[in-house]
Amino acid sequence: MKTLYSPRRFYPVETLFNGTLTLAGRDQETTGFAWWAGNARLINLSGKLLGAHVAHAGLIVFWAGAMNLFEVAHFIPEKPMYEQGLILLPHLATLGWGVGPGGEIVDTFPYFVSGILHLISSAVLGFGGIYHALIGPETLEESFPFFGYAWKDRNKMTTILGIHLILLGAGAFLLVLKALFFGGIYDTWAPGGGDVRKITNLTLSPNTIFGFLLKSPFGGEGWIVSVDNLEDIIGGHFWLGSMCIFGGIWHILTKPFAWTRRAFVWSGEAYLSYSLAALSVFGFIACCFVWFNNTAYPSEFYGPTGPEASQAQAFTFLVRDQRLGASVGSAQGPTGLGKYLMRSPTGEIIFGGETMRFWDLRAPWLEPLRGPNGLDLSKLKKDIQPWQERRSAEYMTHAPLGSLNSVGGVATEINAVNFVSPRSWLATSHFVLGFFFFVGHLWHAGRARAAAAGFEKGIDRDLEPVLFMTPLN
């Protein structure tokens, strides 16, 4: 069987043993790709590729709706969300739906509505995907030139980029509108242990918003992950939405500059590699956000961060021993350092013991007990509220540890049911997916650059050594 190569496409060609297999009317002879190469068979069939993308969107939205309803069906209002293995309901609660003071879930109906809306949307997308994959025109260029494209048409590609940017900007503004006008969102820092509130004075200062980007990603700086109030988060979304929309309009109205035309590879596989790189960055950032940030991901719904659980343990035992008569300000531990309290390198009063490494943690249940120089001894003696004790005791036993199958989880319950925090799930999954997307970016970028240079012609099977070897039998 001859090795296929199309100069028009500069794409590698796969030659299989079952090269005669025809799937959906497209075989290896006509497309240059075997059935398992998936959407590569549709590179030049814009109508069919549209069907594949719409159907894929339908699958994503179907998962969201079905999983949403599954979590609603299993939800127990009396238990914290993070104890129930939920990953979708915490996001809805963070947006302020169904939540009361202290992060208590008072109404699950909005969650049910969310699931149903996603299921209905997925049906529409699924129908559209099947229609375009099986019935609609194979190519859009002739019948619907606005939706048609050629991969090498740089102007059309940047127009499509612009449309995508406008849609992303609109998405960012949806959060801004929800926070400002439509009921507000959940603020873990609201006095008394968190509540839903409208954001009235969002941060628009470019110095503050873009200052996050100039911070070091390490240590106490923490880059954008260090954001610790909703005003900055919503202000950031306002800036992001504005930049995406104006950038989208710019890309629709302009043509790429000469240096851009020279610098980039202009092919379908190149665009795939750029997209994978962007998604990889998103995945790594999301991983850091959900692991470290207890403002964007409130601990009431996602469980405490690692440092938070550690500090909660120190606080819980300080409360207990103080009640039993211990002098928490002066008691020494086995190393001669303070058992309950000590000083940080810069002089603040911090919790003693192993949790000293997390001395710069900020958490809503702990901040009211600080003074101008770290933890305030008089507040620790007189001002500790019952809700702070309850919350820290709960967080102490729900540290985000353990493997994802919970074999190495923390045995926090009397019946030895191991606990795995949603923070562990979400951080690990986004890190792993971010890594795989990065590898996919390298793979497709390499292939796209090779194809553009003209030397990616597939494997020449005529001289493959195995063809000249004696059969095994």
Swiss-Prot record:
Q: How does it assemble?
A: PSII is composed of 1 copy each of membrane proteins PsbA, PsbB, PsbC, PsbD, PsbE, PsbF, PsbH, PsbI, PsbJ, PsbK, PsbL, PsbM, PsbT, PsbX, PsbY, PsbZ, Psb30/Ycf12, at least 3 peripheral proteins of the oxygen-evolving complex and a large number of cofactors. It forms dimeric complexes.
This protein's species is Welwitschia mirabilis
Name the record gives this protein: Photosystem II CP43 reaction center protein
Task: Look up the signal peptide feature and give its range.
Answer: none
| Residues bearing PTM N-acetylthreonine | 15
Q: Which residues form the propeptide?
A: 1-14
One of the protein's GO biological processes: photosynthetic electron transport in photosystem II
Q: Where does [CaMn4O5] cluster bind?
A: 367
